[in-house]
Amino acid sequence: TVSVTLGPSRLGGSSSGVVVPDMDLLELPRPPSTSPWAYVKIAEGCDRACGFCAIPSFRGPQRSRTIESILAEVDVLARSNRSSGREGGGEDATLRAREIVLVAQDLAAYGRDQGIGQRDIIPLLTAVSQRVDWVRLLYLYPSDLTEALIDAILSTGVPYFDLSLQHTSRPVLRRMKRWGDGEQFLERIARIRELEPDAVFRSNFLIGYPGETEEDHDDLLAFMEAAQVDWCGLFTFSRESGTYAASLPDQVAPELMAERHAEASELAETITAERRLDRVGRTIEVLVDAPGVARSTGEAPEIDGIIAVPEDLTVGSLLEVLVVDAEGPDLEAVPVSDHTGG
């Protein structure tokens, strides 16, 4: 294992204030996948100016990879064969990727910096979906969730929507320099569920942004109840040096932030548990990630719950299972053939 430390440097040692990365993260070599899924980064940096975020200051503006380079990487991952080391218990076996997870700071903005159109994520998504069984998008801005993109995601057979909402109160979102409000977000979610009732949603919310009132917090809780987001990440605000939010007035006291975070977390955990319980008794397709561990299209790797399955199922296989139990964010399932005696 090689540790790589990336930090900002100034071009030519000048004091112009232009900060660039020491190494373009897009040029880092990708290690082979030891799981039947893999992340593929399609762009680095971000052109947005969210009030709480320092990413543009140290990763720079968005730089998209070419479609050709992305597809070449996907092809390599999709062709890799399971090595004999896996059968013998080796930990460095390389698996063929059955799922590709596309990631970027601003995924739907892919290609705009190259001047090749406003919706290049759609043809890229389509091309990747033709190479692997599942393709998943992580981190979509709600303002970019067009009907065309919704249709493209649903057509892949992975109805999973990771939406970067951050809050639902219009005043808070405007102080964050972000688009939308809870009502607009609910309309998008309802539209997707109208098209695909089994669609799964993930989002992150920032608690205690400067100026957040009790009314704002209640607005967020009401949205969570109404939206029934399956997977919810909750974070408390912390000042990032150099960001717009760092110098805003009306900073929320840490004790109050912690109280609001606990309240929202309890609600989020309850919603997740209830939505998982609704899956008991259903037959779903899963990908076996590791001995005894699987996921369906409704769980992103590493960040969502898992599905416990018999340990003798082949890692990297896709199969139908019957969900027999739920505990919090996790499910338990058995192969359909076992349950039917076939």
Q: What is each PLM-predicted segment?
A:
Residues 118, 153-155, 220, 249-252:
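Short, hinge-like loop/turn segments at secondary-structure boundaries
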Residues 212, 228-229:
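Contiguous mid-protein beta-loop-alpha structural module that forms a pocket-lining wall or clamp
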Residues 50, 70, 102, 137, ...:
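Conserved, mostly hydrophobic/aromatic
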Residues 236, 247-342:
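Terminal RNA-binding accessory module
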Residues 79-82, 92-215:
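Conserved SAM/AdoMet-binding glycine-rich loop
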Residues 33-36, 46-48, 167, 199, ...:
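Short flexible coil/turn linkers enriched for glycine and charged/polar residues
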Residues 1-82, 89-91, 95-111, 182-194, ...:
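Proteins enriched for Cys/Gly/acidic motifs involved in redox and nucleic-acid/cofactor modification
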